[in-house]
Amino acid sequence: MKVKVLCRNPDDYVRETTRDIQRVPRNYDPTLHPFEVPREYTRALNATKLERVFAKPFVASLDGHRDVISCITKHAKSLSTVISGACDGEVKVWNLPKRECTRTVQAHEGFVRGICSRFCGTSFFTVGDDKTIKQWNMEAPGYGVREEPINTILGKAVFTGIDHHQREGTFVTCGQTVDIWDEQRSSPVLSFSWGVDSFSSVRYNPVEPDLLASCASDRSIVLYDTRESAPLRKVIMQLRSNTLCWNPMEAYYFTCANEDYNLYTYDIRNLDVPVTVHMDHVSAVLDVDYSPTGREFVSASFDKTIRIFPKDKGHSREVYHTKRMQHVICVKWSADSKFIMSGSDEMNIRLWKANASEKLGVLSTREKTAANYNKKLIQKFQHHPQVRRIARHRHLPRDVLKQKRELKEMKEARRRKEQNVRKHSKPGSVPLLTEKEKHVVKVVE
């Protein structure tokens, strides 16, 4: 007699320990799940709501400065170290995990205009209103030993910015001219000038370190190649740019922070038109810094807010503000791309999360899986009206909201005026300019 017996492998359904979750057999045939999309939509909506509920971006405030913070820089090798300079000439070294100041140096008389770390992380450079460049050891001196700079260079004019080469012992400063310096020499190796009174900012390209760019007082952005004896080209804009930052992943893109409340991303291969115009601030943009991934950047503005922009989008995905925070002077993105540091008028350095709702600390495997699943669901249903409305909603200070409405009315009035002028003029006499073309005056080779 033949008997048919069901035979199952216990490994397919039995838990290894009592703490494991129960194994549930699933059939992924879509015909068996007709309500799969409505269920996913509900989950996406709930995930979006929870994301806004848990959006607590503020992490810590580092206080200790006695004057306005003028500049911040990151340590080249250490994630936990940040160096800041103030308007009273004081430089402080901070330990971020402990949230405390580990060292204080009276570096300059007057403003500290710029700080940069050496590429190996053994020392850092500062420039100030006292016309000096000073190199300081990254390690604090022993107990009772007086704090002295490793090297001091006396310049002929005030320096307004400094940046270090990514691989070699050279650095660049800006003031009345853009100067390339060797660490072993007390005079510049190379100087660039192009009929400009002064420069406000200069940055090396992190990918192509022979390229650098500067912002000038005549509303221009000038590009240089250290292998050449003269500047390459410059683009003149409607208003002055305060500072700029290169994309760390794509060598030919840089973003500049402008006085006209916007940021502009340029491709150095075609400077006639910016690649993207980033609009959301309601006052002058003072600083900008890219994420190490090169996909986003953060901007600091005179309107007392910080905004995070995707590199290819015209509007910000996030805005940070507090009641106590005043005009934001400088901003930096941490090297692990998880945190943002900002320095403002009321003498505080604030630490923010790059993703406002991200949970800090070690996550379990199930937490990671759930977070990734929710992220994909939100991405899948991001254009649905309810999901989009909740994801975009932000609370703004009353002043910022009022200025935003005023700017919107002004832009609409300007657009109507241009339409009326074009309507009552000879066809073709009034050119139709796009938003990107309006802000560039000319490119000089």
Curated annotation (Swiss-Prot):
InterPro entries reported for this sequence: Sof1, WD40/YVTN_repeat-like_dom_sf, WD40_repeat_CS, WD40_repeat_dom_sf, WD40_rpt, WD_repeat_DCAF13/WDSOF1
Highest taxon listed in the record's lineage: Eukaryota
Entry GO CC: Cul4-RING E3 ubiquitin ligase complex; nucleolus; small-subunit processome
This protein's pathway: Protein modification; protein ubiquitination
Location of the region described as Disordered in the Swiss-Prot/TrEMBL record: 411-434
Cellular compartments annotated: Nucleus, Nucleolus
Protein keywords: Nucleus, Repeat, Ribonucleoprotein, Ribosome biogenesis, rRNA processing, Ubl conjugation pathway, WD repeat
Family (UniProt): Belongs to the WD repeat DCAF13/WDSOF1 family.
Name of the protein: DDB1- and CUL4-associated factor 13
